[in-house]
Amino acid sequence: MKVLVIGGGAREHALCRSLSLDPDVTALHCAPGNAGIAEVAELHQVDALDGAAVTALAGRLGAELVVVGPEAPLVAGVADAVREAGIPVFGPSGEAARLEGSKAFAKDVMACAGVPTARSYVCTNPAEVDAALAAFGAPYVVKDDGLAAGKGVVVTDDVEAARAHANACDRVVVEEFLDGPEVSLFAVTDGENVRPLQPAQDFKRALDGDEGPNTGGMGAYSPLPWADPKLVDEVVQSVLQPTVDEMRRRGTPFSGLLYAGLAITSRGVRVIEFNARFGDPETQVVLARLKTPLAGLLMAAATGNLADLEPLRWSDEAAVTVVVASHNYPGTPRTGDPITGLDEVAAQDAPHAYVLHAGTRAEGDAVVSAGGRVLSVTATGADLTEARDRAYRAVARIGLDGSQHRTDIAAKAAGA
């Protein structure tokens, strides 16, 4: 099978790594990719938001499956263009991707499907914002209605900060604060059938102890030793299947990866948000534990044959990923700094630990930083303690001037 992956982050590196290990994959391509993906896939320069260009590239390569990684191309309808050319594509239509592209749309779908979520108001002017903030009280939760690379949400006790964030957006969703730990659960769907993956937990704040501003994610781990063993089945029945059914009822079936961001509250499971693609950095730990070949799973979803797929197989091992970010992230990051220690990790820590590239590029023989989140250092182990130790041992080998990372990823879950 010839596969083309669209994107260039650590999520896409994780996807490409798993696909490169799949014996059914005979040729692997990625556009635009990054310095790490270049080691496992042939790279192509293309505008990931240009559906016609992506479709032309897929046709030229003879791709039998196209996997669209990031949210922006999905919302822009890239999967539609590929699908219209008769090429199987893993990723929802632009209309279905509105589940992520518009939080107000997602709230409407959840209301119609009876999916449990936070009470909320959609606000388009300061008066509506003030009324909503007063209705719910602190902590205030204000979400940009559109895409914001994981940084469009403000949770604060400061009403002025909440107002300022709302006023900087065209339309916001103001909602009640949900207590309890957060869980990310991915499900592969062909628009009718749902296959859940294993749950993970990510760390959204920039600093240890969940302090600092929100980011795209600073680390993740799986499995969740503290979670109810029935959690996945419960979420499939109360959240994922009803949402997929409602999207199909609306005439916009959702095919691809449906990501439910959940809060395990004192009143039960509540949906915080939906995403229309694999999450980053959770994908790094979930795929590290998936034993079922990835290409067949994605192809089954892309072609409507998920019901025929055998049950997914999982490793009993734990996985931890730690994100190494540039100086000043999540503000404007410093880029162009050389990265050292990558060969050392490959020589001394493989196969239990490895580095997935995000914001990197090749510059001569060197690899340099090219974005905010630069690397995802991922490790597996018999339990979270071993996986965590291996991940941080590998992180310590990496040199990047001014870089930052959290030191407490999976610490509480591992009992550290």
Swiss-Prot record:
Report any one BP term from Gene Ontology.
purine nucleobase biosynthetic process
Catalyzes what? 5-phospho-beta-D-ribosylamine + glycine + ATP = N(1)-(5-phospho-beta-D-ribosyl)glycinamide + ADP + phosphate + H(+)
Q: How is the cofactor bound?
A: Binds 1 Mg(2+) or Mn(2+) ion per subunit.
Q: What name appears for this protein in its UniProt entry? A: Phosphoribosylamine--glycine ligase
Q: Which UniProt keywords apply?
A: ATP-binding, Ligase, Magnesium, Manganese, Metal-binding, Nucleotide-binding, Purine biosynthesis
Top-level division of the source organism's lineage: Bacteria
Pathway listed for it is: Purine metabolism; IMP biosynthesis via de novo pathway; N(1)-(5-phospho-D-ribosyl)glycinamide from 5-phospho-alpha-D-ribose 1-diphosphate: step 2/2
Q: Quote the Gene3D superfamilies the UniProt record gives.
A: 3.40.50.20, ATP-grasp fold, A domain (3.30.1490.20), ATP-grasp fold, B domain (3.30.470.20), Phosphoribosylglycinamide synthetase, C-terminal domain (3.90.600.10)
Where do the annotations place ATP binding? 133-184
Q: Name one GO molecular function term.
A: phosphoribosylamine-glycine ligase activity
Entry cofactors: Mg(2+); Mn(2+)
Q: Which Pfam families match?
A: GARS_A, GARS_C, GARS_N
Q: In which organism is this protein found?
A: Streptomyces coelicolor (strain ATCC BAA-471 / A3(2) / M145)
